[in-house]
Amino acid sequence: MRPARRRFGSVRARQGFVYDDGFMDARTSSAGEDFLAPVVNFAMRHPGRMLAIVLFAHLVVWTALPLLTSANLELDLAEDLALGKEWQLGYWKHPPLPWWIADLFYRVSGQIGSVYLLGPLAVIACYVGVYLLGREMMSGGQALIGVLGLVGIHYYNYSAVKFAHDQMQLPFWAFAALFFYRALVRGKALDWLLAGAMLALAFWSKYAAFVLALTMGLFLLFDPVARRSLGRAGPYLMALAFCVVIAPNAWWVVESGFLPMQYVGHRAKVAQRAIEFVTLPTVWISSQIFFTHPTLILLGVTLFPRRQASAAARPSPEQAFARRYAAVMALGPFALVTAIGIVTGRTPVAMWGYPLWIFMPLAAVLWFGPVVDALRLRVFTIGYVFLFLLGPAIFIGTFISDHYSRARPKATEFPGAAIARHLTREWHEKVGTPLTYVAGTEFAANSVAVYSPDRPHVVVHGRPQFSPWIDMADLRRRGALVLWEEGLVAARPDEWRATFGAQGEPALLDVPRATSRRTAPVRIRYWIVPPQP
C-alpha cells in the first residue's frame, strides 16, 4: 500500500520515510549463530522498543553512579536547589528554568538526591526528540542508529550527572528542530507554533539557544525550499509563539541591565595578542574534536567505505531537503559559535559545545547511510556497547583512582551537610530563631542553603545586587550567617563586614571532608550576624 502524501513546499513528500533502509532479516541471519544477530534483528524490527530499553539503562546507570559515589551535591546541583526556590524570572548569570525544575523535583520528592535524576532525564528527552526527527526523515532503524551514535560524546552521559542549564537545553533544541522540520514539510500551523514555543523554552534554559535560532533563521532564508514558507503565515506564527513564551524573561533581562550577557562576557577568554585570534579558536575547535572523537570513530567504521548503491543513488527532492536540514542543524550552530568567537576575539568555553552535536550522527546516517548489511550493523552494535560500558568504567575508575592520586579536593567530598548542621545548631543556640539568610562564597553558602533544615535564602556572592529576592531591611531584622572557605580568592570578608554589619573577628570551623583518603579539612570562617532592632 502506498503511504499517504503531504505537502512539501511546492513538491510532494511521502508520509513516512524519506528512504527505507532496505533491512530484511536475511541480512543479519547471514551472520549464522552470531549472538548479536537477535539483538540487531530486534532493534531493526522494533526500534522504538529498543530505544526505550537503552534509555532506561541510561537512566539507571547515570542516576545510580553519582548517587552511590557522592557525599555532597555537585556544584551545579547545589546551586540548583539553593536558588531555584526563589522562583525568579531571571538570575544574574542564567535563565531560570533548570533551577525551577530542580526545585519542583525537590518539593515533590522531598529528597535532595532526587535531582540526580534530572540530568539523565534531560538527555533521554533529547534522545526522544532526535529519534522523532529521524523518523520524519528515514526508517525507524536508521533513526535509532542516528540517536545511539551519540553514545561516544561525554556531554550526554558522563557529564549529564551535573544537571544545570547545559543539560536543560538539550530536549528543547531537539524538539525545536523537530517541529521546525515538520512545519517546513507539512505547513501546519500547530507545528509552527510548537517550534516557536520550543525555541523559547530553549532560551529559558540557556541563552546559547541564540545560535540555534540564528541557524534556523538562516536556513529559512537561504534554503530554496524552506524559503517558500516565508510567503505563508507559518514563520510569523512561530515568531509570535516565541515572543509570547519568552516575553517574561526578556522583560527581566532588560530590567536587569542585561546582567546575564555581562556574565557571558566575563566567562569567554578575550584575545590579548594577535596570535591568540588563531590559537584561541584552535583550542575551541580542538576541544570539540576531542569530545566528539569516539562518536566520529564509531560512525566512521560503520559508514565507510560507502556502499556502492548508496554512493551512486541520486537523492529524491525530499531526501535532498532532509539531508540539507540535518547537515545545517548538525554543523550550523558550531560554525556560528566559532565564527562569532573569531570575529569578537573571544574563545568559547569548551562546555558550550553541549547542545551542538545532538544531530551529528543523524546527519551522518542521512548523508552516508543507510546502514543495512549485517557486518556494518554488527560493527555499530559492538562499538555502541563498548562505548556505553566505557563511560561508567571511566567514572568508576576515576572515583577509585582519585582516592590514591588526587591532590585537589572534590566538590562531592565537601562536608556540606555537616557544616550546615553545625552552623544551624549554633545559630539556634545563639539567636533562637530560624536561620533565614546565608551569604558568602558560592559553594559554602549554597550547601548550607540546601542542607540546613531551615533552608535559608542565599545572598549570592554576598552581593545583594545579584540577589533581588533579598529584602535587606528584613535581613537586618532577622540576621544572617556569613561564611566562606578560608583561602579562596572569591572571599571578600571586608566587603561582607560592611554589607551585613558583622562585628569582631570571624569564627573558625574545621570540618573533615567526606572521604576516607587523607586530605586537609575544610576550613570555614564565619560570622553570625544577629538581628538588629
Specify the residue positions occupied by each region the protein language model found.
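Membrane-proximal, lumen/periplasm-facing interface regions of secretory-pathway glyco-
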Residues: R346-A350, V372-L435, T441-V458, R463-F466, ...
